[in-house]
Amino acid sequence: MKLPPFELHVPRTLDEALALRAALGSDAKVMAGGQSLLPMMRYRMLRPYALIDISRIEALTRFDAGPAVRMGAVVTHADVEHCAHPGPLFDLLRAHAADIAFVPVRSRGTVVGSLVHADPAGDWPLLLAALEASVELASLRGRRTVALRDFVRGAMDTDVQVDEIAVAAALPAWASGLTRWGRCKLMHRAGEFASASALAVQRADGRWTCWLGAIDPGPLELPATAGLLPPAGAARPTREEVAASALDEIRAARPHGDPLAASRHAQAMARAVEQAWQGVST
């Protein structure tokens, strides 16, 4: 299906983009990679009068390695997949990026675009929520930073205001010191959106954080399950115990959810934890 007619603006500076955003208001959409926006336009789910293509703004291409990692709005999945920075955090980021769709999508799709799209099945909302990321928003009124857990308000619903552009995603300094991680992404076929996904991360102080993705209305934290996981060297819960704890938390948080989906997510969490202990992440 062909795209509907629209007016295209290609600013070269952020100031120019923000001026366009303020002038065009709700009649315009901001596009970085277009891997979610353009298909929605083809199927007439969205019909903006204008697109503001920010992919040529050099200031938004920066990928700062830390100690507080920061990814500009035009940093693609492929940029993350092929980054050369060392350490467990970047091993996790690379593995996560490499598992997204196919090469053409990873070459155009952006990390921040995934957050703004806020599809519950998207990959980056899960990982960046678990790492306590924040989103930087800019407008002619100024800048503000919003924690990702507050930024995503629901399925495809975020805190971006009509005159704002999401310009970066940033990780806190503690994320650079994580010691181990495990992730699990269940798909019907390679390259598809996940039917269930899970992430377990251990911080430098030994504490764990456990999150689920591909679940409505957005990423779900499992603090009780994380509390079961001890520091390295201590007695570990069994896979069955992890799955049972996760299932209890899912049922409590989503009492009207699909029981089969809840079971899939619980098993994904158990696999993610198991891989974290083994030092194997797939």
Where in the sequence are the language-model features?
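C-terminal structural segment of proteins
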Residues: 1-282
